Curated annotation (Swiss-Prot):
One MF term in the entry's GO annotations: G protein-coupled receptor activity
Membrane-side (Cytoplasmic) residue stretches: 32-47, 103-123, 190-245, 298-337
Function in brief: Orphan receptor. Displays a significant level of constitutive activity. Its effect is mediated by G(s)-alpha protein that stimulate adenylate cyclase, resulting in an elevation of intracellular cAMP.
Name of the protein in question: G-protein coupled receptor 26
Organism: Rattus norvegicus (Rat)
Disulfide pairings: C79-C156
UniProt-annotated location(s): Cell membrane
Length: 337
């Protein structure tokens, strides 16, 4: 194993560790907070988190073993199962992000009718459709024997070893990426650009009110005026940064892998195996970044994390006080005798 392989193996180990911790923390927050569970987006987040954990436990370790051993890391049946999960979880992850963007679009653009438009029943229906959509492709690939170990990505994933099926496999793979990656990307762009438009409109209204107030307050201190103007500038940039993060992480993580798969199908030029594994690692890194992008940085999840930490530390302090009290009583008893 050369330095490239060692670096890729280290990247996979780090991704597995971060993904387990962050997604596990999101799951604990969902179990702990009834307020979060009552909201429709909790179903999308739960679906995304469980998929990320399953990918972290099954697919990432097999890819790590494939990178280290430079060969198929498991038997044919286990590899086909892992390839089925890899295809299903990739599509499910992308479509779940699209569902979350639709939820935020409805919440921002139609705030008064949001509760009527996005109930838990509606969210459950969207999750069910996501599963059905995502299951279609791996089930088809399983029926056509297009699941197995792919040496270029050191992973159990979509692959076809028969030259006479090259065209059919290329059409199938293109349809899979078009109806998962491209469809989700279009939905993300449409919904978040609508959200950005509404956010900028509200910022303009607030800016007008702020400027009118500053004009009326003649005796206001210059430092207060500067703080108001700085807050106005931050308000304009906040929505743009968030939306850029949502769309940017989606592209950075998934686009290299999707483009590599398509180039592999329609080009005769050889692709370096290290790049293939790196593109797969980038796709896996989405599982590690999703909890921070969609959950843990939000106020409700931060509050739930604080409550969990306080509960843990309070139990420890009570336990330590109890032990101290017991030892103190044991020291006193012999004296009283």
């Amino acid at each position: 194993m050369n330095s490239w392989d060692a670096g890729l193996a280290g990247l996979l180990v780090g991704t597995i560790g971060v993904s387990l911790l962050s997604n596990g923390l999101v799951l604990l927050c969902l179990l702990h907070s009834a307020d979060i569970r009552r909201q429709a987006p909790a179903l999308f987040t739960l679906n995304l988190t469980c998929g990320n954990l399953l990918c972290t436990v099954v697919n990432m370790p097999l890819t790590l073993a494939g990178v280290v051993a430079q060969r198929q890391p498991a038997g044919d049946r286990l590899c086909r199962l892992a390839a089925f999960l890899d295809t299903f979880l990739a599509a499910n992850s992308m479509l779940s992000m699209a569902a979350l963007s639709i939820d935020r679009w409805v919440a921002v653009v139609f705030p008064l009718s949001y509760r009527a438009k996005m109930r838990l029943r509606d969210a459950a229906f969207m999750v069910a459709y996501t599963w059905l959509h995502a299951l279609t492709f791996p089930a088809t690939a399983l029926a056509l024997s297009w699941l197995g170990f792919h040496q270029l990505y050191a992973s159990c994933t979509l692959c076809s070893r028969r030259p006479d099926e090259r065209l059919r496999f290329a059409v199938f793979t293109s349809a899979f990426h078009a109806l998962s990656f491209l469809l989700s990307f279009i939905v993300l762009c449409f919904t978040y650009l609508k959200v950005l438009k509404v956010a900028r409109f509200h910022c303009k209204r607030i800016d007008v009110i702020t400027m009118q107030t500053l004009v009326l307050l003649v005796d206001i201190h210059p430092s207060v005026r500067e703080r108001c103007l700085e807050e106005q500038k931050r308000r304009r940039q906040r929505a743009t940064k968030k939306i850029s993060t949502f769309i940017g992480t989606f592209l950075v993580c998934f686009a290299p892998y999707v483009i590599t798969r398509l180039v592999e199908l329609f080009s005769t030029a050889p692709i370096d195996s290290h790049w293939g594994v790196l593109s797969k690692c980038l796709a896996y890194s989405k599982a590690a970044s999703d909890p921070f992008v969609y959950s843990l940085l939000r106020h409700q999840y931060r509050r739930s994390c604080k409550e969990l930490l306080n509960r843990i530390f309070n139990r420890r302090s009570i336990h330590s006080v109890g032990l101290t009290g017991d030892s103190h009583s044991q020291n006193i008893l012999p004296v009283s005798e």
